[in-house]
Regions:
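Acidic catalytic/metal-coordinating carboxylates
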Residues: 41-44, 67-70, 91
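Short, flexible helix-to-coil linker/hinge segments that flank and couple to helix-turn-helix
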Residues: 94-159, 201, 212
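Active-site residues of response regulator receiver
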Residues: 60, 88
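Recognition helix of helix-turn-helix DNA-binding domains
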Residues: 169-202
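The feature encodes the CheY-like receiver
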Residues: 19, 64
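Helix-turn-helix DNA-binding segment
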Residues: 141, 147-182
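Acidic, metal-coordinating helix/loop segments flanking the phosphotransfer/catalytic sites
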Residues: 38-56
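Short amphipathic alpha-helix used as the core "switch/output" element in two-component signaling
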Residues: 47, 69-81
Length: 213
C-alpha cells in the first residue's frame, strides 16, 4: 500500500508483450500492487500516464522510436509529480545518469533478482530513489573517472553501438529501434567520429576495448 493506504498503481512500458505479462504477474503477486495499464511505445505510455496517473511508471529504455529516457522526460514535463522507474538491460552509468537527469526516480537493471522489482516500485512510490546494486557500482566507478571516452555518446548511439558490436546489420538495427537504416548509418558515422574510428571494423574493435559486447 502507499502512504494513503491504497494499492500502488503501476504503469508498465515495454515493447515486448510477453515481458510485460511476466512483470504484471510478478508485481500483482503483491496485494499492495495494481497494474493499471500497459504500453508498448512512448506515445501510448504518455497517454496512459495522463489517463491513469499511476503512482509509478516502469519504463524500459529500448523502446521503438522515442527512447524510454526521452519518454520519461516528456512524462515529467506533462506531470511534474510523475514517479518513474527505469527497468533496463543496460547497466552502464551513462544510461542511469541520463535517466535521472530526465526525471526518473529509480533505475533497476534487468539482471537483478525478480524480487528487486517489487522493492524498487515500493521505494519509488514512497518518493525515494532506488538504484540496483550493479548500476550503483557503475555510477560509483563513473564518478571516480572510470567511464572513459564512451561517455561522449548519446543514449541512442550507445544502443546502436551495442547492436553493431553484437553483429546486427544497419537494417536490422533500424527495425529494432523503429528508425530507417539511413538514420542508423548516420548515427554510425557520428559514433565513428566521436571514437576516432575510420572504418566499421575499427569501430567494432574500439567498442570492444570500451567494454561493448
Amino acid at each position: 500500500m502507499n502512504a494513503r493506504g491504497r494499492a500502488i498503481k503501476v504503469l508498465l512500458v515495454d515493447d515486448h508483450a510477453v515481458v510485460r505479462q511476466g512483470y504484471h504477474r510478478l508485481l500483482e503477486r503483491d496485494p499492495a500492487m495494481q497494474v493499471v495499464a500497459e504500453a508498448a511505445n512512448s506515445r501510448d505510455a504518455i497517454e496512459c500516464d495522463r489517463l491513469f496517473r499511476p503512482d509509478v511508471a516502469v519504463l524500459d529504455i529500448a523502446l521503438p522510436g522515442v527512447s524510454g529516457i526521452e519518454t520519461a522526460r516528456r512524462m515529467v514535463a506533462h506531470r511534474a509529480d510523475a514517479r518513474i522507474l527505469m527497468f533496463s538491460m543496460y547497466q552502464d552509468a551513462i544510461y542511469a545518469s541520463r535517466a535521472f537527469a530526465a526525471g526518473a526516480r529509480g533505475y533497476l537493471s534487468k539482471a537483478s533478482a525478480p524480487e528487486l522489482l517489487v522493492q524498487a516500485v515500493r521505494t519509488v512510490a514512497d518518493g525515494r530513489r532506488f538504484v540496483s546494486p550493479d548500476v550503483a557500482e557503475a555510477l560509483a566507478a563513473s564518478a571516480a573517472g572510470a567511464s572513459g571516452v564512451g561517455a561522449s555518446l548519446s543514449v541512442r548511439e550507445h544502443e546502436i553501438l551495442r547492436l553493431l558490436t553484437s553483429g546486427y546489420e544497419l537494417g536490422e538495427i533500424g527495425e529494432r529501434l523503429g528508425v530507417s537504416a539511413k538514420t542508423v548509418a548516420n548515427h554510425q558515422s557520428a559514433i565513428k567520429h566521436k571514437l576516432g574510428a575510420t572504418s566499421a571494423l575499427q569501430l567494432i574493435l574500439v567498442a570492444r576495448q570500451l567494454g561493448f559486447n
